[in-house]
A protein has these predicted regions:
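Hydrophobic beta-strand anchors of alpha/beta hydrolase catalytic cores
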Residues: 73-74, 104, 148
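A short beta-strand-turn-helix
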Residues: 50-72
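Solvent-exposed loop/turn segments at secondary-structure junctions
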Residues: 78-83, 109-114, 135-136, 164-166
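Thiol/disulfide oxidoreductase modules built on the thioredoxin-like
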Residues: 118-126, 131-191
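Conserved segment of the thioredoxin-like fold in thiol-based oxidoreductases
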Residues: 86, 94-133, 145
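Conserved redox-active cysteine motifs that mediate thiol-disulfide chemistry
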Residues: 76-96
């Protein structure tokens, strides 16, 4: 377990250096959202249970998604974020290819649910979108937008990527890596090669 956390931490450091630009100030939590904290444990920790209602009215529960999928990606965004809007078409291509194994949920802690619904309708994005409490973004350390939190089939936060991913091949590589049955071993071996 310690090797797994160390390997994932080193991977995060390496990937953060490759991150695109994030945009936007982190919104401060409102008093009403303070009661909705997740007790998030960070990279390498188990993601706490969370439930959201999508713009389509569907209730998504993390534990249920992880029974069906090998990877869940929480993408924090807001409508006036130019880098979020650049990332979405690329994310859509990757989602279309990997949706059997990967679920993406675009979480918006800034805009009203009606605005998110209108945005999704005009953008034709097929992955679920939902409003979320601002406290979730704060607790998960979202310092800029977009930020994506990758959660593996065991509920472990395996990557936090700050900034836009604007190359579909990057999504393909991440999805291939984190949906592989032996991804922890592959990452550990890759990192071991780097530090030799």
């Amino acid at each position: 377990m310690i090797k797994r956390i160390a390997a994932l931490s080193l991977l995060l450091i390496l990937l953060t250096g490759c991150a695109g630009k994030g945009d936007g100030e982190l919104p401060k939590p409102t008093p009403e959202s303070q009661s909705e904290l997740l007790t998030y444990t960070g990279l390498g920790g188990v993601m706490p249970e969370m439930t959201v209602t999508t713009t389509g009215g569907e209730t998504l529960k993390l534990s249920e998604l992880l029974q069906e999928k090998k990877l869940v990606v929480l993408n924090f965004w807001f409508e006036d974020c130019p880098w979020c809007l650049k990332e979405f078409p690329v994310m859509e291509l990757a989602y279309h290819r990997y949706q059997q194994d990967v679920e993406i949920i675009a979480l918006n802690p800034v805009d009203a649910p009606q605005a998110i619904s209108a945005f999704q309708a005009k953008s034709s994005l097929s992955f679920p979108m939902a409003a979320c409490p601002r406290s979730w973004a704060v607790e998960m350390g979202v310092g800029g937008y977009p930020t994506s939190v990758f959660i593996d089939r065991d509920g472990v936060v395996c990557l936090i990527h700050a900034g836009a991913i604007t190359n579909v091949e990057t999504f393909y590589t991440l999805f291939e890596t984190f949906t592989a049955d032996d991804y922890e071993r592959k990452i550990y071996n890759s990192i071991s090669q780097l530090v030799r």
